[in-house]
C-alpha cells in the first residue's frame, strides 16, 4: 500500500490553490465542500472559481505564485500546466511539512485525491494511488449506483441517537448487534423509502421501550419489469437482495428471480388462464401471515404491480391489518415491450393518446367499450390478449376500425427470446396461429406499429414477420 487512506479535517482552515483554470476549480470545489477557507493564486482566475472564493470569504491573489503564499496553510494544491512551477510548489510545501497535491504528478504529491462517493456524513473514497485514476472513477461510478443517496440520512439518524444507545447498551457487542439490526431492518427501510420522520419516530419508540421489542415484518411490493434484468430499478434490486421470503408469479423472468437473496425462501404463487396455483385471497393472507412473523416479504410481480397486477388488492389487505409495506414501480410491459420492438406508443403524426386494456377472455368474449377503442389517433395495448386475439381483432373491425390497421403481437418482450409478429387486424390472428406462440405476450394496435419497419433496434429470437 503506497498511500495510507486518511480523512483530513479542513473545517475553517486555510487551503492554498495555485492555479486559476478548470482543474483548479474542480479541486477548489472539493476543498470548499469540506469547509476549507480558500486562498487562490494565479495571474488569471476562472470566473466560477472567483465566485466560489468570494462566497466562502477566501483570498484571491491575481498574480504569480510566491514562496510566501504557503505559511499558515493546512493543504496546498498545485493545479497549473507549468511543470517547473508545480515542482517548486511541491518542494516548498514538503520543506515546510505541509501536505501537498500536484495534479497529474503523483511523484510530487505527499497526498492524493481519491474518487469520492459522497453520502455525507457517510463518505466512500476509492484510490489507485495515482496509477489508474480512470479505473478509480469507474469503480466510484459503480458504487454510486449501489449506495442509495439516502444513506447519508441514515448515517445522520444514527449519529443523533448514538449517545442514547450507548447509555442504554454499555456493552460494545450489544451495541454492535443493535446497530446491525437497525441498518438492515424496518427503521432503515423507512429512511431509504423517503420517510425519515417515521423512521425517527420508530427509533424513539424502540429506545423508550428499553429496546425490548418484537421484530416487525414488512412487505415489499416490487415490479420486476417486462423481463430484462437491466430494467430493474436500484430500489427493486436492493429489496430483492434483503428479503427473507419471496412470493413470485409466472411473469417474473428466471434471470430476475436469480437476483434475489440466495437463502431466501421462495414461494411460487403464479397464475395461468383459468388456473390459479394459489388463489388471490390466499396470496393476500400469506403476505399478512409472513409479515406478522417478523419477516421481510418480497412480493415480486412482472411488469408494474399497479397495472393489471392486482397490487391494489394486496396492499389493501396489508393496510387493513396494519402491516408496513412499500411499493416499487416497475417498467410495465406496454412501455418495455413496445420500446424493444421499435414501436413508439405515441407519435405526433400517428397517435396522441395510448390506452392500456385487458384482453383477458371470460366465457369466450371480452366486455370492453369497443366504440371508445376505435376512436382515431390512439394506440391500443392489450395485456393478456393471446387467447382473445381473434375476438379482439374481429370486434375492433366490427365497430369501425379498418381491417388494414397495423397490429403486432410481442412474445417475451425485452428478453433474448423476444419475437415480434407484425401484420394488420385482418391477418395478425392467422399469422400468430401459424407459429407456436406462448405467453407472456402483448398486443399493440395502431398506426404507430408501422414505424417498426424503421425503428426496430433490438434483435431477439427469430421474428414472426
UniProtKB/Swiss-Prot annotation:
Amino acids binding S-adenosyl-L-methionine: 226, 302-304, 307, 332-333, 384, 413
Positions contributing to NAD(+) binding: 22-23, 43-44
Catalytic activity: uroporphyrinogen III + 2 S-adenosyl-L-methionine = precorrin-2 + 2 S-adenosyl-L-homocysteine + H(+); precorrin-2 + NAD(+) = sirohydrochlorin + NADH + 2 H(+); siroheme + 2 H(+) = sirohydrochlorin + Fe(2+)
Keyword Oxidoreductase belongs to the record: yes
Keywords recorded for this protein, A-Z: Cobalamin biosynthesis, Lyase, Methyltransferase, Multifunctional enzyme, NAD, Oxidoreductase, Phosphoprotein, Porphyrin biosynthesis, S-adenosyl-L-methionine, Transferase
Region (Precorrin-2 dehydrogenase /sirohydrochlorin ferrochelatase): 1-203
Sites of Phosphoserine modification: 128
BP terms from Gene Ontology: cobalamin biosynthetic process; methylation; siroheme biosynthetic process
Stored InterPro entries: 4pyrrol_Mease, 4pyrrol_Methylase_sf, 4pyrrole_Mease_sub1, 4pyrrole_Mease_sub2, CobA/CysG_C, NAD(P)-bd_dom_sf, Siro_Cobalamin_biosynth, Sirohaem_synt_dimer_dom_sf
EC id: 2.1.1.107, 1.3.1.76, 4.99.1.4
Active-site residues (renumbered): 249 (proton acceptor), 271 (proton donor)
Region described as Uroporphyrinogen-III C-methyltransferase: spans on this chain: 217-465
MF GO annotations: NAD binding; precorrin-2 dehydrogenase activity; sirohydrochlorin ferrochelatase activity; uroporphyrin-III C-methyltransferase activity
Pfam families: CysG_dimeriser, NAD_binding_7, Sirohm_synth_M, TP_methylase
Annotated function: Then it catalyzes the NAD-dependent ring dehydrogenation of precorrin-2 to yield sirohydrochlorin. Finally, it catalyzes the ferrochelation of sirohydrochlorin to yield siroheme.
Family in the record: In the N-terminal section; belongs to the precorrin-2 dehydrogenase / sirohydrochlorin ferrochelatase family. In the C-terminal section; belongs to the precorrin methyltransferase family.
PANTHER family: SIROHEME SYNTHASE, SIROHEME SYNTHASE-RELATED
Record protein name field: Siroheme synthase
